[in-house]
Amino acid sequence: MRQSIKGRALRHFTLSTGKSAGRNSSGRITVFHRGGGSKRLQRKIDLKRSTSSIGIVERIEYDPNRSSRIALVRWIEGVLPGRQRKFKTIEEFALPRKILESTTATIFCLFSFSSLSSPLAQGETASLSFGSSLGFPRIAVAGAKPAFFAERMREKKIGKKTFSLCEIRKWRTHCVLWAHRIKRKAALSWQSLRQQKTLELVGAAEHNESKLKADQGSLLPRQVLAYALCSGRPSYLHASRSFYKALLPVEASRFGSLPAKPPIGEGPKDGAYKVDRAPVTYILASHQLEAGNMVINCDCSKPSKSGFLRPAQNAHTYLRFQELGRTVNKGRVEGGSQLAASWPRPPAYRHEILDLNSKVGNSIPLADIRMGTWVHDIECHPGQGAKLARAAGTYAKIIKEPASQCLVRLPSGVEKLIDSRCRATIGIVSNPNHGARKLRKAGQSRWSGRRPIVRGVAMNPVDHPHGGGEGRTKGGRPSVSPWGKPTKAGFRAGVGVGKRRI
């Protein structure tokens, strides 16, 4: 497997983690010879792979926190929520060439500014759908960085409808920043309109209030009270009724014309500021998985509508029906063959589809995997995520025909029964030569966070019970820890424990 690393990991899928240096929460050393090491960023790995979609491997990257490699996958399906493609035949599965390009991606997003009060922003709606050209409204382009939006305008003239993977970082950053900035502009425009209306209401209220000679000492600030009455907040209902009576008859018609204030932190309900999820994720790379290969996720909880991706829509029910048919056929006689032939039978297993799905890197249920197949990233419970066989070069083997429970031989040699609805990834975990590597110098061990191991006889008497003395001697006592506790297997038990047994 060639390791194609171009640039750093995506910032959206990285997070920083602290180091404990072998200490627990109370500060005591629980694991010796740990500490130091180079700085690392944790990668967010999609171990569940719950999205029923097809993806293309963009590149294979190095992960300093695990022994295997990781793959950056760009998902073709599943980016648009609520839309799924139907593939009835194998010929319809042929994808366009522009989708199979390893450096392109398409993101869905919708901007709507019909609710804004600005005359330039009203009625402007720019939609970015699957395969449509990138377009942004004026309010989003105004004041933007030329390095990001200038390329989009040039591509619009040229006719390019996708953008490169290197701009996904910019898209994630700018999409969130512009969402907050657009919200801020909308709030400012709404506040300016509300302040203008409030001043008019306050002026009319002052004119009517002077006639009624209301008690001014029991009133709240007029602007705040007028703002509360306009927005319809019930927290100011305990205020003086004279101000409300003076305000309501004059400007009662204006209350219905003013727009209601949206809750704090929420925008319009048409999805104007909704940011779609990223079209790429990190997964554990399989051996012989290279950039440009296609991988498939088959989700049992959300069966795909396509018969091409899921040969058995309900494999668990089909296997139970198959076992029932075998039990009934054991007592069948020759004369009843015609009667048995008329019984309903499940559809024949399409082995050509299973061979197509059983490619390296595909995540499919154990019920759809043939006997003798090498798998990794196995789930213990359906939908839990990969738990078994995740280290570099490890794999498990299917050693029994799929039934309600599948028998799997783990890398340790233990045979375990796992629910057939659990999913596993075809192939072996990448980087199988991880165990054969050799450290060229002591610094490589320190880079990995391992501190040197020092023998007790090489220390001083103040540091260890075995320290001191002339030459390599430990004073004739058995091996003990730095605190004087026995460390050999025969000396760990208390004195006289075996004699107490009757």
UniProtKB/Swiss-Prot annotation:
Record keywords, A-Z: Mitochondrion, Ribonucleoprotein, Ribosomal protein
Alphabetized InterPro entries for the sequence: NA-bd_OB-fold, Rib_uL2_dom2, Ribosomal_uL2, Ribosomal_uL2_C, Ribosomal_uL2_CS, Ribosomal_uL2_dom3, Ribosomal_uL2_RNA-bd_dom, Translation_prot_SH3-like_sf
Compositional bias annotation for Gly residues: 493-502
Keyword Lipid metabolism: no
One BP term from GO: mitochondrial translation
A GO molecular-function descriptor: RNA binding
Biased composition (Basic and acidic residues): 463-473
Matches recorded under Pfam families: Ribosomal_L2, Ribosomal_L2_C
Region annotation Disordered: where it falls in the sequence: 458-502
Domain of life: Eukaryota
Record's keyword annotation contains S-adenosyl-L-methionine: no
Localisation: Mitochondrion
PANTHER family assigned: LARGE RIBOSOMAL SUBUNIT PROTEIN UL2MZ-RELATED (PTHR13691:SF44), RIBOSOMAL PROTEIN L2 (PTHR13691)
Name this polypeptide is given: Large ribosomal subunit protein uL2m
